[in-house]
């Protein structure tokens, strides 16, 4: 009897329809300019597909990600796109897009940011800091590049990688951010080592796929560097919401790199901005010298800390200085502060944003919307 039951069921099993494979979601560019025909393909963590297998099947692969993302970027035809969406090893595919720096204005004037983050009250003209000054810590500036020959870096800066058409900083934004982090005159952490990773071109913009490639590079490269007091990544860039960029930022953070990112300059909730909306990184809003939220600064629950961002003077290309504004200028204050605190106290990447919040000066800022922290960065020196 048992054999006859099995025999009766078997034809039904053989006749059952084969389930349609799941189709991987196609994520469109949100709040950013899409790049036609270019995509970021995220593979499942358990994928059997393999990058080498992908290269043999897809001639348009451009960037391969192995650390902060399991996947690659590629130029795809509509046919290749749809074929990949049906591949069981593909988790999602996201349209590549243009992201850009978060600096908005230029004007003459001296910086005040260093004095503000080293005193509880406004009005001081001196920057107070421990002489350890971030020694032994390393900061990667993921930006337009760093002019490492600028004399104010004293030989502690190196431009090491480019995903743009040129390696040098032809814009100035990355050099400015690096100067706020660790230059002799304008820097928060005056003994830190700085590494430039160029992901934005000389107009200040670049593709999402190149930004992720730069982050992937940092996750790998830091393992070969002598950074006994830990590693920081400073990202003064952003655009619309990107799941791929947020995941890359989260994985870079979880790998042991403290990641500071700009909240953005749209005077709106940063929840739809990447990488600012990634909850595990440290998202930075900007203030002016009167302790008012900068008119351009984004806000919202994803913002972790505020720092000086209006009229900040720092290093510039050509061995010069420049005074500009943006959450781009606030972010390197926090990247530099993290390096300073790593050098002074130690600690972990995962705990550093909380440490900066604990140290911060509370409830002195104005024009802070409801639901946004009222925390101004402070280095604890006075």
UniProtKB/Swiss-Prot annotation:
Pfam families: Inhibitor_I9, Peptidase_S8
Description of pH dependence: Optimum pH is 9-10.
Endpoints of the signal sequence: 1-15
Positions of the propeptide removed during maturation: 16-102
EC number: 3.4.21.-
Modes of activity regulation: Inhibited by phenylmethylsulfonyl fluoride (PMSF).
Localisation per UniProt entry: Secreted
GO cellular component terms attached to this protein's record: extracellular region
GO molecular function: serine-type endopeptidase activity
InterPro entries assigned to the protein according to its UniProt record, in alphabetical order: PCSK9_ProteinaseK-like, Peptidase_S8/S53_dom, Peptidase_S8/S53_dom_sf, Peptidase_S8_Asp-AS, Peptidase_S8_His-AS, Peptidase_S8_Ser-AS, Peptidase_S8_subtilisin-like, Peptidase_S8_subtilisin-rel
Swiss-Prot/TrEMBL keywords: Disulfide bond, Hydrolase, Protease, Secreted, Serine protease, Signal, Zymogen
Domain Peptidase S8: 111-382
Cited PANTHER family: ALKALINE PROTEASE 1-RELATED, PEPTIDASE S8
Stated name of the protein: Alkaline serine protease ver112
